[in-house]
Curated annotation (Swiss-Prot):
Record's function text: This reaction introduces a second double bond into the aromatic ring system.
Name the UniProt record assigns to this protein: Chorismate synthase
Keyword annotations from UniProtKB, A to Z: Amino-acid biosynthesis, Aromatic amino acid biosynthesis, FAD, Flavoprotein, FMN, Lyase, NADP
Family matches, as InterPro entries: Chorismate_synth, Chorismate_synth_AroC_sf, Chorismate_synthase_CS
Chain intervals with Basic and acidic residues compositional bias: 40-49
Length: 361
């Protein structure tokens, strides 16, 4: 009811605020016997961690995760896994001047009206700082999924007006943009440097792909795999749109083009993005998400205060000029959590189902 838990069988509940003591998560439903240690989670957290390049927020959080429960002698026990990350680099004084003002396009106004109180320090619970716990929980899901041959990866496919064609997975983790085309890096660097001089921000597009997904994941009609994946990705801060497969480009396609024809050797295309009728087809699961430009910029903006009076807001603090730069690990985590939950749900109901039809490659 309160919206802090994700999943049905594999559940993740997060807690904590941007400038609070710590962030935490309870991960429940993980099968026992999964080899797990903090370093498995730390790898993905380090990919998301703030302050790692001049193009992201300069808030420097080590994001060292602690596993408090649910793991014994290096393996999961099947009981709830408690995770904790302490906040160490808060600068709450940066927000003292806006405690009675609403930053344009932020959650300040809506949180104030919904709860009657808000933690104005860095956005409190509405801050993307919360996503650190999603990444940690997602790493647990990814560890299990890998044992089943499922791999989740993502990359930046657009930064502002700059389209980025996919070239190679090997390049993605070698640069701060998660860019799959090394030849694009100078253009991205120059664009971000100019953006900082302009004291402005920009949006981005992230693509996430899961390979090795078996046929059959998804629970029609209301818990279709693509519906739950869209829900998961839309829950990420600043995401304003999600596409599965060709998404909105399908509007201009004809049926003769869009249909993914099949032969005994396999599918001839994947316009559907790996989902047919809400159920995984065994093809790569492909999703794209659009992130808006943050309104946390140093240019003055018109707004109101808690009394309804007109004010001019200048946002202080340390912010990402493009929140999409660090969104790839978060999107990967949410896809992994969705797949983990549906894998367990499918196994619970349909583990004994057998068909004579071969699986297409």
């Amino acid at each position: 009811m309160s919206g802090n838990t994700f999943g049905k069988l594999f559940t993740v509940t997060t807690f904590g605020e941007s400038h609070g003591e710590a962030l935490g998560a309870i991960v429940d439903g993980c099968p026992p016997g999964v080899a797990l240690e903090a370093s498995d989670l730390q790898h993905d957290l380090d990919r998301r961690r703030p302050g790692t390049s001049r193009h992201t927020t300069q808030r420097r959080e080590p994001d060292q995760v602690r596993i408090l429960s649910g793991v014994f002698e290096g393996v999961t026990t099947g009981t709830p896994i408690g995770l904790l990350i302490e906040n160490t680099d808060q600068r709450s004084k940066d927000y003292s001047k806006i405690k009675d003002q609403f930053r344009p396009a932020h959650a300040d106004y809506t949180y104030h009206h919904k709860y009657g109180i808000r933690d104005y320090r860095g956005g409190g619970r509405s801050s993307a700082r919360e996503t650190a716990m999603r990444v940690a929980a997602g790493a647990i899901a990814r560890k299990f999924l890998a044992s089943q041959g499922i791999r989740v990866r993502g990359y930046m496919s657009q930064l502002g007006p700059i389209d980025i064609a996919f070239k190679q997975w090997e390049a993605v983790d070698t640069n701060p943009f998660f860019c799959p085309d090394p030849d694009k890096l100078p253009e991205l660097e120059a664009f971000m440097d100019q953006l900082r001089r302009d004291q402005d921000s920009v949006g981005a597009r992230i693509t996430v792909v899961a390979d090795g997904v078996p046929v059959g994941l998804g629970e029609p009609v209301f818990d279709r795999l693509d519906a739950d994946l869209a829900h998961a990705l839309m829950s990420i801060n600043a995401v304003k749109g999600v596409e599965i497969g060709d998404g909105f480009a399908s509007v201009a396609q004809r049926g003769s083009e869009h249909r993914d024809e099949m032969t005994p050797q396999g599918f001839l295309s994947n316009h559907a993005g790996g989902v047919l009728g809400g159920i995984s087809s065994g093809q790569p699961l492909i999703a794209h998400l659009a992130l808006k430009p943050t309104s946390s910029i140093t240019q003055p903006g018109r707004s109101i205060d808690v009394h309804g009076e007109a004010v001019e807001v200048v946002t202080k603090g340390r912010h990402d000029p493009c929140v999409g730069i660090r969104a790839t690990p978060i999107a990967e985590a949410m896809m992994a959590l969705t797949l983990m939950d549906h894998y367990l749900r499918h196994r619970a109901q349909n583990a004994d189902v057998e068909v004579s039809t071969p699986r297409l490659g």
